[in-house]
Amino acid sequence: MTTIRKNHPLFKAANSALIDLPAPASLSSLWNFGSLLGLCLISQIATGLFLAMHYAPETSSAFASVAHICRDVNYGWLIRNMHANGASFFFVCIYIHIGRGLYYGSYLYKETWNIGVVLLLLVMMTAFVGYVLPWGQMSFWGATVITNLLSAVPYIGESLVQWLWGGFAVDNATLTRFFAFHFLLPFVILALTLIHLIFLHETGSNNPLGLPSNSDKIPFHPYYTIKDIFGFLVLLFALISLALFAPNLLGDPDNFTPANSMVTPAHIKPEWYFLFAYAILRSIPNKLGGVIALLCSILVLLVVPILHTSKHRSLTFRPITQFLFWLLIADVLVLTWIGGMPVEAPYIITGQIASALYFSLFLILMPMASWLENKMLTW
């Protein structure tokens, strides 16, 4: 059996990635979230495939087809609830995964980190086009508002928006192409995930101390396979509990009303996991400026490895930067809250301060804290 595992062309690749992989002995549960993201992706593809079998990507029947799935298809309600809430769990895992990377200096594996940022952008795009598919009020108006942001692009903006819409407004052509994108992109994400792993296995995993762990490695199986399976069980238990007991907790009530281009909802807002970026977008009182800020809120992650000046990799031994990291987490939570609030005082100024702090932490305060900590090492 060992010979097949180590010599077979297919099995040996899986063996070197999942069984005989040398892993640091001190990985905490924060290192579980990569495998949990893999589980979320597989779960979303599986449930999405079954939903696609019954969904009708056509404006006159999309909303009714989702109702049909929930009422008439065997366990359709469960599949739909698992898929909708699975997206929320996906983003919980992805944000914790990124937070762990920032805290422990995993971004110094630059190729792995950069592919991770591309994956984040693709997952966000997939979730956005997926939110449009039920064709409720918030689906329609969310699509209208966000796609309209492209009109801020100088010179070609208007043409770009009409090209994306397939007409002069969000309509049937838009829904059809968004369904095509939503079906295709998870498989692109799957392929990029494999590349993400290939680059990770070139260097090996980082560890909580941020120190080289070549002298202290253990085989991935059984130690971390058991740990990952435990993580899977916890995640699935939480997801199934949410899907069964409070399936609409994270959704928007407006989306239970079929899309109507003649009636605008009082407050147009995206799903909770985009609210921090939406708050940053709204904090700039200029359309193009807001779009640039929105993009930079994600792309700022690409400059984190460049701005790393500390002699330590991890924040484990860096109390000042540790404080700034938790300030960043609090700031993102404040932005998430502001994104769900109406555009009025005091939310406007609070959002602007939180947005300024968000970029300051990444671009100014954390690099300065690293420089100060380096100085303190020589005192």
Swiss-Prot record:
GO terms for molecular function: metal ion binding; ubiquinol-cytochrome-c reductase activity. It comes from the Eukaryota. Its cofactor is heme b. A ubiquinone binds at residue 201. Binds 2 heme b groups non-covalently. Heme b b566 binds at residues 97, 196. The chain crosses the membrane at residues 33-53, 77-98, 113-133, 178-198, 226-246, 288-308, 320-340, 347-367. Its main location: mitochondrion. One of its GO terms (biological process) is mitochondrial electron transport, ubiquinol to cytochrome c. CDD domains: cytochrome_b_C, Cytochrome_b_N. Heme 1 (or BL or b562) is low-potential and absorbs at about 562 nm, and heme 2 (or BH or b566) is high-potential and absorbs at about 566 nm. PANTHER family: CYTOCHROME B. The cytochrome bc1 complex contains 3 respiratory subunits (MT-CYB, CYC1 and UQCRFS1), 2 core proteins (UQCRC1 and UQCRC2) and probably 6 low-molecular weight proteins. Component of the ubiquinol-cytochrome c reductase complex (complex III or cytochrome b-c1 complex) that is part of the mitochondrial respiratory chain. The b-c1 complex mediates electron transfer from ubiquinol to cytochrome c. Contributes to the generation of a proton gradient across the mitochondrial membrane that is then used for ATP synthesis. This is Cytochrome b.
